[in-house]
UniProtKB/Swiss-Prot annotation:
Source lineage: Bacteria, Pseudomonadati, Pseudomonadota, Gammaproteobacteria, Enterobacterales
Gene3D superfamilies to which the protein is assigned, alphabetical: Alanine racemase, Lyase, Ornithine Decarboxylase, Chain A, domain 1
Underlying gene: dadX
Pfam families, per the entry: Ala_racemase_C, Ala_racemase_N
Catalytic activity: L-alanine = D-alanine
Family statement drawn from the similarity comment of this UniProt entry: Belongs to the alanine racemase family.
PROSITE patterns: ALANINE_RACEMASE (PS00395)
Organism per entry: Escherichia coli O6:H1 (strain CFT073 / ATCC 700928 / UPEC)
Protein name: Alanine racemase, catabolic
Cited NCBIfam families: alr, PRK03646.1
Residues bearing the modification N6-(pyridoxal phosphate)lysine: 35
Active site per database record: 35, 253
Domain of life: Bacteria
EC number(s) per entry: 5.1.1.1
């Protein structure tokens, strides 16, 4: 028998989450963001469940080619654009829409020998200060691109640094309005948070990411608990060992947990080499045999310990949900001082994945 840990992906939940996105932004088209191997879910496993989307948005050329080879004929948006001028030949071959965010890309597009024009997303720096042109340069750059034979349809895009907060949206929107002055153009601005909470940012295309996979863009599950969004990934394992501690005995590396009274603990086949956060402290929520309990002690490479006091019936082989339908990944991430995005993307290759 194989080690009992596995991740299961609920494809019906993924479909439902896309439907909820459409309800939230009924007048916009949807770029389903599948970067980082579909946020750790596996782009080849899940893309067909998102087949009702209007387009896919990602970063890696290899993933874009995979979608084409799997039969996706719709739009694909490369969120960081092309990284080398020679990439444009492949973009042309596979009909990819590219972000343009830097001066060197303008020259590369001008000089490229393409069979047909490429659609362009011109990126505005609206305050994130990662990629994009400053608002006062956008009109000039737009006109340069518009004059190029290699450029097809154009859209203005940006990415919000603080879409969870009204002030963050308003300041970014002001910069975008400055950039768009004098332009009649399509826009794509809304990430997951703006899709859910800021209708004024929807415009022509929304770009949901984390909410497709059933986690909160704010990092707090309570913020999306009433939306109908459902977790797609469930990470589960089993108890493979049981220890009965005496009062004063300690658990795990460094002995960071001490039993106050006699206590049973379960040893679970899951650790940081599987993608469970090493920094998850004692008290991180976990479900044992359907009962809410908590981790105790330091997470090891391959194992972690849980308190069996609330579930005395538990023993060898008892199922454990580490995150998923009942234990929300946002709650585990918050306990560990990180975000659900990171936990999804950190799922280790050695963890078997099944779709349901």
């Amino acid at each position: 028998m194989t080690r009992p840990i596995q991740a299961s992906l609920d494809l019906q939940a993924l479909k439902q989450n896309l439907s909820i996105v459409r309800q939230a932004a009924p007048y916009a088209r949807v770029w389903s963001v599948v970067k980082a191997n579909a946020y750790g879910h596996g782009i080849e496993r899940i893309w067909s469940a998102l087949g009702a989307t209007d387009g896919f948005a990602l970063l890696n050329l290899e993933e874009a080619i995979t979608l084409r080879e799997r039969g996706w004929k719709g739009p694909i948006l490369m969120l960081e654009g092309f990284f080398h001028a020679q990439d444009l030949e492949i973009y042309d071959q596979h009909r990819l829409t590219t972000c343009v965010h830097s001066n060197w890309q303008l020259k590369a597009l001008q000089n490229a020998r393409l069979k047909a024009p490429l659609d362009i997303y011109l990126k505005v720096n609206s305050g994130m200060n990662r990629l994009g042109f400053q608002p006062d340069r956008v009109l000039t750059v737009w006109q340069q691109l518009r004059a190029m034979a290699n450029v097809g349809e154009m859209t203005l895009m940006s990415h919000f640094a603080e879409a969870e907060h009204p002030d963050g949206i308003s300041s970014a929107m002001a910069r975008i309005e400055q950039a768009a002055e004098g332009l009649e153009c399509r826009r794509s601005l809304a990430n997951s948070a703006a899709t859910l909470w800021h209708q004024e940012a929807h415009f022509d295309w929304v770009r949901p990411g984390i909410i497709l996979y059933g986690a909160s863009p704010s990092g707090q599950w309570r913020d999306i608990a009433n939306t109908g969004l459902r977790p797609v990934m469930t990470l589960s394992s089993e108890i493979i060992g049981v220890q009965t501690l005496k009062a004063g005995e300690r658990v795990g590396y460094g002995g960071r947990y001490t039993a106050r009274d006699e206590q049973r603990i379960g040893i679970v086949a899951a650790g940081y080499a599987d993608g469970y956060p090493r920094h998850a402290p004692t008290g991180t929520p976990v479900l044992v045999d359907g009962v809410l309990t908590m981790t105790v002690g330091t997470v090891s490479m391959d194992m972690l310990a849980v308190d069996l006091t609330p579930c005395p019936q538990a023993g060898i082989g008892t199922p454990v949900e580490l995150w998923g339908k009942e234990i929300k990944i946002d709650d585990v991430a918050a306990a560990a001082g990180t975000v659900g995005y990171e936990l999804m993307c950190a799922l280790a290759l050695r963890v078997p994945v099944v779709t349901v």
